[in-house]
Amino acid sequence: MLAGKARPVGDNRVVAINKGQSVELRREGEDPILTVLGEFGDERAVHRHGSHGGAPGPRHNQIPEPDRRVDNTTIWEPDFSEAYYEKLLYSQKSGVNSMANYYIEQSSNRYSVNGDVTPWAKVRYNAASYGADYCGSIVCADTWYFVDDSVDEWAKTLTTAELNAHLAKFDVWDRYDYDGDGNFDEPDGYIDHFQSVHAGEGGETGGGAQGSDAIWSHRWYAYFSANGPDGAGPHGFGGVRIGNSDYWVGDYTIEPENGGVGVFAHEFGHDLGLPDLYDTSGNTGGAENSTGFWTLMSSGSYGSSGRPVDGIGTKPMHMGNWEKFQLGWLKYDVARTGEHSAHRLGPAEVTTKAAQGVFVVLPRKVVPLDLGAPYAGEKFYYSGSGDNLNNTMTKQVAIPAGGGALTAQVRYDIEEDWDYAYLTVNGEHVQTSHSTDTNPNGTNLGEGITGSTDGWEPLTADLSAYAGRTVTLGWRYNTDGAEAEPGFMVDAIAVDGTMVGTAEADEGWTFDGFRTTTGSEQTTFANYYVLENRQYRGYDESLQTGPYNFGFLNTLQNWVEHFSYQDGLLVNYWDTSYSDNNVGDHPGGGLVLPVDAHPKLLHWEGGTADGTLMRPRIQSYDSTFGLERTEAYTLHNNGVPTRIPSLPAARVFEDSRSYWQDCDAHGCTGAHPGRHQPGWNSVDVPNTGTSVRVVSESNKGSFMNVHVN
């Protein structure tokens, strides 16, 4: 930990944050994964929202062999067998390109995975029944049916006793500390790490023959509302039961039949707790940031050797130092702005006697929070904002005999159909004038409030069923792991006209995440520069061979041209005031974004003389600082070439200068010609007077000396 007051417990793997609340800091050793292969049947399912139609199948081994004269992107094997996945995922033999070896290298031999792969199990329904994007998102809750159906079909091949004996080794970890004892090293009834592989191509690469009916690769939790077909699950945590066994699947990842090491490692990174670092709106044609090929958790999952026969995604780039730090896998130094320090940096890809990275601690960032004025008085109640919240406020309230009319004023901006607020009585959700029971994504726990209001609006609820009783009245705010909106606000809470919540004084409410606020606050956040010496070593050889551009989409939709990312010192800005890297929502800012050492924007030439920009993952290729000139390249846009010239080395990073721009001669962000906007590239750093100088590099570039001031 760089700073904080957490208290280590035991062997320091677990840290107690507050009494009765513990978190696991780092992972050591090896985790088992259960991988179930599932292929599709021919029937069309009729779900609660109707049939999605679609073609029969596919079965496995039906992906057409690509013509390598026109397709250098598709991964293909003549037989996607159990043995193929056992090698791809779990081989630890030296020199084998596998997910296990990838994680050995990322963790500097601290961590890896092993696992079992099942035979292909055929589910009843076709791919469209599980993968159609009916919900308006690229991932819909019907994928939970596929997880359920595929594990049940596989379970039919074993007796219940055989299932239980086999599955016991996959449940040794209590991920969510269900009993609150701080002991994570105990079974909890759920498979610790579950991986589903579906026949056919993934939706993220176009879906192949299935197109929009193909399942997108993702990590999620099946029926986390505990409302699935198999019941509430162990401890009420939801999930699906594996046959008639004692074990359930809750957390899962899902990947396609022809997924490479990259997509499997990326999704498993989510299972370890890492977020997406690309702009997630880009999945559906939105924005793109400049993390590009610099990290597995962005386009780096699509690294490769550059050989047409391998396709793309076979050899991912490394995680960045921020991700390795989150997992406890980084050897690092700490520097502070305004203090001179010298650091010898080894390559980020391996552990040497030198540090793999440096964290430069900056002055705390002050961010104003303007939620708007209270409905009445000087304060109101606020849920807070963020991912994975389960915030509450509760109070003992007497409901008068013959009464029970609750009124309140509410104002909210909640991620529609994904996040919800609730009115609760004795812990149960109750109906209000703002609540709904619709549940398109499986995240409404019942009578949820979602979407947004236009200012303060009245809310009513009938609590007459509790008349004459004293109850625990409460509000709850529950969010998923993405797209945190401002949240839920409530004021002037009354029962039968008697005020029970004005937020003006201590009225007996107990807060767990909720708080009172005037609506205007100033919050401070930690922020850092994260330095890493990126070299063409190990899986980062793909920085030299793997970055690509679809330069001929008008004639060759599945052909890419390759170029290299520049090795050297990568400076990332880690800003904890953000929870994501969605620069389309907040240009120039994000959770952790690379500083572009050569920030002059690159434009396509030829037929796009209107100033159309190259996409940020191309702009970011020369982001590193160092002693060498950048490489020159020629890239294409619909076959029209553009020459990118070599630029002088950038030896010094100084945050007193700007490495980000919101406009160029052709327009500003939001009004610039073309899809990609100026403000999406690089990051707007704070002016703290910090500088980082690359003083020297070894003759082979493996080590560098840097000075921080």
Each predicted region: which residue ranges?
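Short, surface-exposed tryptophan/glycine-enriched loops
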Residues: 447-472, 476-480
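Loop/turn elements at helix/coil->beta-strand transitions in domains of secreted/extracellular proteins
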Residues: 30-34, 189-194, 292-293, 408, ...
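Extended, low-complexity, turn-rich repeat/linker tracts enriched in Gly/Pro/Ser/Thr and Asp/Glu
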Residues: 401-403, 411-420, 481-484, 539
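Active-site-proximal segment of zinc-dependent metalloprotease catalytic domains
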Residues: 1-290, 709
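Extracellular beta-strand-rich recognition modules
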Residues: 404-412, 470-478, 503
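Non-catalytic C-terminal accessory/binding modules of secreted extracellular proteins
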Residues: 46-93, 97-110, 114-117, 144, ...
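Short, tryptophan-glycine- and acidic/Ser/Thr-enriched carbohydrate-recognition patches
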Residues: 505-517
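Extracellular carbohydrate recognition
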Residues: 418, 479-496
